[in-house]
Amino acid sequence: MRKRFEQQLSLGVLPISEVKINTNSRHQLPPLLKALQHIFTTPDLNKAVFDLLEKELMSGKQKTGRFGMNLWEILVLGSVRLNLDADYDHLLDMANEHMALRGILGVGQSDFTRGHEYKYQTLVDNVCLLDEELLRKINTLIVEFTHGLIKKKEGVADLDLRMKVDSYVVEGNIHFPTDLNLLWDSLRKCLDMVGHLSNRGVVLSGLGKHAYWRKQMKSLYRNAAEIHRKKGGNYKERLKVSTKQYTKKSDELRDKFRSAVLVLQQMLEKGMLDLRKALFFKSLIYYLGKLEKHLDLVKRRILNGETIPHSDKEFSIFEDHFQWCSKGKMHKKVELGHPLSIATDQYHLIVDFELMIGIGDAQAGRVIGGRIIENYTSGYNLESISFDRGYYSKLLKKYLEGHFEKVIMPKRGKKTLAQQAEESEEGYKQLRRRHSAVESNINQLEHHGVNRCPDRGIKNFRRYVALGVLSYNLQRMGNLLIAEERAAEKAERIVRRAA
């Protein structure tokens, strides 16, 4: 059971609306806290955000039982984690020790009590409840509200939007893959599962000395890997000899694991494995599959001299969804993760984003363009949208030209006379030059943690990216609110001096 938020005020504890935030600091946290405070104290926005949180996190749940972390705390802590690019230990320390953050959370301490203290596992279990679709909806609300502030400031009814779309790679938290080290990863994880089962009283024939097997296999892996790394005289012959020894022992171990799986399957059918043992057995089957795959790849590439097709390769046994991304950049020839396309406006807000998993640039442009047209029609003029050459698609450009006044999408390769004339227009060239501003937005987004994702699994990867985008936009909203406050204070000082 969860509640939206109920601040139990005690003596000396300030309401969230009265929490003082140091807006003179240039640190990234105060603007975020300012934006969160504004969400909480603005009735319409507060209701819209909490309605979304309540619908996604509490639908189908009973209204009885123990209270969990409330919805407001989940949103605040998730945003702060990405704003600071923090791990959960850092977040725990901030949640328990940072006075302004605790004030926004509604658990501020007083002279008489320290107040509520969070636990590590509580943060881990609750922040991960937010999913990509929920965060995407909240992000749209925040962008629309911030645009409303800009409309009020500029005194316009409809806002002209000039969009810029670009992509970069969000990396995963994995080591650089080779077929040799992926085979070793598979071997050691199989041995780990056997070790866990052995420690719980499951005796498997031929695998009693799993620690010895681990030491022996690591030695064989290191010998082959060092020859591969250092090269030297007769490199290919020496590598083949070393790899033969490595794969021979791997074959022997694989056969033992196969026999162990058959024994464990019989034990499972007879009800001899408890839940913990059954989970280790399931993991053993998974890692055995990876072992067989990478053992085959090592034999094909090194011993048989085959060129392995890209479709047959995997880049991690733990995160097999990651892509090998090579964008031709000087200092990052290869990145392992997923490309992310973002669309920003002239106010540097990220109005939409799309993780490019199994799709190319042009397809991502179609998805982003479609959502922008759907979400930002009423109260907006879609003035322009710009891309780089990688997004070029004749069909995409034609589709967008039906909704945007100007579409900047340079064509790769040879151009027709009409295309040359279009790209030579002064307005076209001006918007194309302004497109590079999206790079600074990407850089700031990377500083919000969306450069390398530490969370495991594709679902958590998507959530992490969406939370980073939301945190980025909240900081932009906070900066705008702080600027308005300063302008109002300056105007007030001028009036007082004139009086």
PLM segments and residue spans:
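Short, conserved catalytic/metal-binding motifs centered on acidic residues
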Residues: 77, 91, 119-127, 159-171, ...
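Electropositive, glycine- and tryptophan-enriched low-complexity nucleic-acid-binding patches
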Residues: 329-376
